[in-house]
Amino acid sequence: MCIYSISVSSSIVWKPCATPSGKIITGDYAPDHPHQHGLFFAWTKSNFRDKPTEFWNQKKKLGDIRFHQFLGKTENKKSLSLQFEQIFTAGKDFDQPILKETWKITVPGKELPHHQFDLTSIQSCATEDPLIIQRYHYGGMAIRGNDQWLKLDEDGNLLGNMISSDGKNPK
């Protein structure tokens, strides 16, 4: 189950997301990363008009992502889709849109033996000037995991075990 929460003064926050057994897998404002919540785009190292921008660490105020408008819903026997537009700004130095993003969230219309949603994000420049996304070791679509993943067992080991799609542990 996923619930979206929207306010005109903030970005779209898509949370909580749960496993089929009901365990919440997304989190927000974790003590070690208080600037992350739900599902979001993390363009960590970028430039607009030769000035640094960042959409990962909100405390720096070098970038902001805001809900702009609800574009509508489509409902039929197969699915329900919601569409929203967000705008990215360069934060405190440039409050005008530099990037537009459309989210389309589709949920199957029939009961399935599992929970599922499809999220499509389309991003495009909002000005003639491009947002330059620089190479970095992380970035793009991100998920703020549940803070329970950071809890330690009796031996001081993380209770959560994160592996890549290749079955590798990132540590």
Which residues does each predicted region cover?
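Structured loops at beta-to-helix junctions and adjacent beta-edge loops in soluble globular domains
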Residues: P20, E85-I87, R144-N146
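Residues that flank catalytic or metal-binding motifs in active/ligand-binding sites
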Residues: V13, F117-L119, H137-G139
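Extended, loop-rich substrate-binding clefts of extracytoplasmic carbohydrate-active enzymes
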Residues: P31, H35-P113
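Beta-strand-rich N-terminal accessory domains
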Residues: M1-H35, T120
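Active-site/ligand-binding surface loops and adjacent short beta/alpha elements
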Residues: P130-K171
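Short, surface-exposed beta-strand/loop "edge" segments at domain boundaries and coil↔beta transitions
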Residues: C2, K23-G27, F88-L99, K151-L152
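Short, surface-exposed linear segments at secondary-structure transitions and domain or protein termini
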Residues: S11-P16, P108-P113, G145
